[in-house]
């Protein structure tokens, strides 16, 4: 509820004169969790670059858990699927190789085989 009354990155959620009346909320870009698998000095991320695999997994898990359990959010797009040039925000490297075990990525995105996947849809 507080989010709907504020701005995101200094941008209003709704245009002047409009308000939330129950319409689906789509998070059209989120993520930016940087984790480099090479040692380039030019690597960049939106936040501090995660230093190791464990902290990267914790950060991703935290983000996805919040998004998927928020009942108002009906869809989302993670940024980004792969690293590009100097940005290390991808789930996969620039060579399209998973940065962590593919099973770990799957568990973060969809849950584990022994649990129900978390769904944003009530």
Give the positions of each predicted feature:
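Substrate-binding clefts and catalytic carboxylate motifs of secreted carbohydrate-active enzymes
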Residues: 1-122
């Amino acid at each position: 509820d507080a989010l709907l009354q504020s701005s995101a990155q200094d941008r209003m959620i709704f245009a002047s004169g409009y308000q939330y009346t129950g319409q689906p909320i789509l998070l059209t870009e989120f993520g930016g969790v940087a984790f480099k698998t090479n040692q380039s000095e030019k690597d960049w991320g939106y936040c501090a670059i995660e230093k190791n695999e464990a902290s990267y997994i914790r950060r991703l898990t935290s983000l996805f858990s919040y998004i998927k359990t928020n009942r108002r959010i009906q869809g989302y797009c993670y940024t980004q699927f792969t690293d590009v040039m100097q940005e290390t925000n991808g789930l996969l490297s620039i060579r399209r190789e998973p940065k962590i075990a593919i099973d770990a990525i799957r568990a973060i995105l969809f849950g584990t085989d022994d649990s129900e996947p978390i769904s944003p849809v009530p």
